[in-house]
Design a protein with these regions (language model features):
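Structural preference for solvent-exposed beta-strand-turn elements
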Residues: 2-33, 39-508
C-alpha cells in the first residue's frame, strides 16, 4: 500500500497542469477551489486507483486551503490599503496649488490698487476676494478685484515656483501685507481634498512667510469668481499727460448725488484731433479741451483714413479717480509708434482706451481698469457757457488761492459763502466771510480789473477747487452780473480749460 501511494505522487509532478484542471472541472465546488489554491490537490486526485482512501484524504486537504486563503488574503491586503490611503492623504496635503516669492512692498502696492475695486458690502461672497493668478512661464502675478461695475487687473513680476490661481480674502490680506516689514515674502497655497471628494482645490490652506514670522489663512476656489468683460471695440491712444490734465480739470466738479447717476461721472467726447472732458454737479461746470494733433490717435481712422463720428461716453468718477491716481504715482504704458519713413521708432507714453456699448477699459503699464459707462443723456454744457463778459479780474493764482484758504476757515459751514467786492479804482478785490457765533474774516488782494465795480458771492469751496484745477501762474475771473454764471480760465497752457461757477444770491 505504501509503494502504491508514493509512485503516483512522483508521477503527479510530471503531469501537465492544464490536464489536471480539465479533469477537475466536473468535480464538486470544494475540489474546484482547492485546485486554484494548492498544488497538493492534484497530487491527491491524480491516482486513478481503486483504493477508497484517496478521495477520503482529498476532503480534509481541500478544506485546509479554504480556511487558509481568507486568512492570508486579509493579512496581506489590509496593510497595503492603509499605506495607499496614507500616502494619498499626505500627497494631497503637500499638493502646492500656488507659490510665489516677491517683495513685500511691491505686493502691498499692487494689492492696495486691486482692492480699490472690492465693494464694502459685496453682492456675492466671492466678490469680497481678490483673485490671485501666478504664471510660471512669464514669472508674473496678476491680482484682480471686481465689484461687477469696476474691475482692476494689476500685474507685477515675481519668482513663481508653482503657478495657479486662487481667491483670497481681500481686506484680510491687504491688512496683513500693509503691516509687513520691507523684504522678501513667500505666498503659498496648498490644495486639500474634501472628505469623500476626489476634486482637489475646493479647500485651500494658504500662508504668508516673511523674515520674522508667518501667518496662515484660507482661500477658496476661483471657479465662482466672475470674469472681467472683454472689450474689443474702438480703441484710441491718449497721451498720458493729456488724460491726466483732463481728469485733474474736471473730476472735482462731478456730483456725489447717486440719484443723479449721469452727473457722477465725466463726459468724454473723442474726435479725430480733439478730446473734451466735461463735468457738472448742477452748481458748477468744468471743461477741458485738448486740440493738438497728438491728442488722439485712433487705430481705425489711421488704418482706413476715414473720419470717425465723435465718440461720447460718460465714465464713472470712481473709475477715473483710480486712473488719475495711477497716472500720478506710476509710470504709464509705452507703445511703439513708427515714424512716417518707417526707419526710426520712438517710445511715446500713452494710455489705451477701448470702447464698447456700456463698457470701456483703460490699459496702462501693468494695469487694466474695466468699468461700465453711465447711462442717460448728459446735459448740453456748451449752451450754459456765456460767450461775452462785461468784467475781467486777473489774479495771481497761488496768492489768491492762499487768501481763500485762510478765510475759508471762518466761513459758515452750512453755506460756505464768500462775498467779493470788486473795486476797479483801487484795483483791489476784497473777500469777506462770516460765520454766526464763530467770527469773520476779510482779505484784500491786489488784482488787475477791467470793467465796473461789482459785489458778487460764491461758495468759497467751489472757488478753491477751481483755482486748484488750473495749473497756470495767473488766472482770469470773467463776470457779467451778480446773478449770471462766472468763469475762471487760466492764462497760457496747451489745453483749453474753464470752470463755471453759479453765484449765490445774497440779501443786503
Amino acid at each position: 500500500m505504501t509503494v502504491t501511494v508514493e509512485a503516483p505522487v512522483k508521477s503527479v509532478e510530471a503531469v501537465n497542469l492544464q490536464e489536471v484542471q480539465e479533469e477537475a472541472k466536473g468535480k464538486g465546488k470544494q475540489a474546484k477551489k482547492g485546485k486554484s489554491r494548492s498544488k497538493s490537490k492534484p497530487q491527491i486526485q491524480e491516482p486513478v486507483s481503486t483504493e477508497t482512501a484517496v478521495p477520503e484524504t482529498a476532503v480534509p486537504e481541500t478544506a485546509v486551503p479554504e480556511v487558509a486563503v481568507p486568512e492570508t488574503s486579509s493579512h496581506e491586503e489590509a496593510p497595503t490599503q492603509q499605506q495607499s490611503r496614507s500616502k494619498r492623504k499626505k500627497a494631497d496635503q503637500k499638493q502646492i496649488a500656488l507659490k510665489i516669492i516677491c517683495s513685500s512692498d511691491v505686493l502691498g502696492q499692487t494689492l492696495a490698487i486691486a482692492c480699490r475695486a472690492i465693494a464694502g458690502r459685496p453682492s456675492h461672497p466671492v466678490l469680497a476676494n481678490v483673485l490671485v493668478q501666478a504664471d510660471v512661464e512669464s514669472q508674473s502675478v496678476k491680482l484682480t478685484g471686481f465689484d461687477l461695475s469696476l474691475g482692476i487687473e494689476a500685474t507685477f513680476s515675481a519668482q513663481v515656483e508653482a503657478g495657479g490661481k486662487i481667491c483670497l480674502p481681500a481686506k484680510l490680506l491687504n491688512d496683513i501685507v500693509s503691516k509687513l516689514p520691507s523684504g522678501e515674502v513667500t505666498l503659498w497655497c496648498s490644495s486639500k481634498e474634501s472628505e469623500g471628494d476626489e476634486t482637489l482645490g475646493e479647500k485651500l490652506s494658504c500662508g504668508l512667510e516673511y523674515a520674522s514670522g508667518q501667518v496662515s489663512f484660507s482661500g477658496i476656489s476661483p471657479e465662482e469668481f466672475p470674469s472681467l468683460p472683454k472689450v474689443d471695440g474702438r480703441a484710441v491712444y491718449l497721451p498720458s499727460e493729456t488724460l491726466l490734465e483732463g481728469l485733474r480739470g474736471t473730476l472735482f466738479a462731478t456730483s456725489t448725488d447717486e440719484t443723479k447717476q449721469v452727473l457722477t461721472g465725466v463726459h468724454v467726447t473723442l474726435e479725430r484731433d480733439e478730446v473734451e472732458f466735461a463735468s457738472t454737479d448742477g452748481h458748477r461746470l468744468a471743461v477741458v479741451k485738448a486740440t493738438t494733433s497728438s491728442a488722439v490717435e485712433d487705430e481705425y481712422t489711421e488704418s482706413s483714413g476715414s473720419h470717425e463720428e465723435p465718440t461720447e461716453v460718460t465714465i464713472p468718477g470712481k473709475a477715473l479717480y483710480l486712473v488719475e491716481h495711477l497716472l500720478k504715482s506710476l509710470p504709464t504704458s509705452s507703445r511703439r509708434i513708427e515714424e512716417s519713413e518707417g526707419e526710426e521708432e520712438h517710445q511715446s507714453s500713452v494710455v489705451e482706451v477701448r470702447f464698447e456699448p456700456g463698457q470701456l477699459i483703460f490699459r496702462m503699464d501693468n494695469y487694466q481698469i474695466n468699468t461700465r459707462t453711465l447711462e442717460g443723456q448728459y446735459p448740453n454744457i456748451h449752451q450754459l457757457i456765456p460767450k461775452q463778459f462785461l468784467r475781467e479780474v486777473t489774479v495771481e493764482r497761488r496768492s489768491f488761492l492762499s487768501a481763500m484758504e485762510r478765510i475759508a476757515i471762518l466761513a459758515d459751514s452750512k453755506n460756505n459763502v464768500v462775498k467779493f467786492s470788486i473795486d476797479p479804482t483801487e484795483q483791489m478785490i476784497t473777500a469777506f466771510v462770516e460765520a454766526a457765533n464763530v467770527g469773520s474774516g476779510k482779505e484784500a488782494i491786489p488784482v488787475d480789473i477791467s470793467g465796473e465795480s461789482l459785489d458778487i458771492a460764491f461758495n468759497i469751496k467751489y472757488v478753491i477747487d477751481a483755482l486748484k484745477s488750473l495749473s497756470s501762474s495767473d488766472a482770469i475771473l470773467h463776470i457779467n452780473r451778480n446773478n449770471t454764471p462766472a468763469i475762471f480760465t487760466p492764462i497760457g497752457g496747451e489745453t483749453q480749460k474753464l470752470v463755471l461757477l453759479m453765484p449765490i444770491q445774497i440779501r443786503d
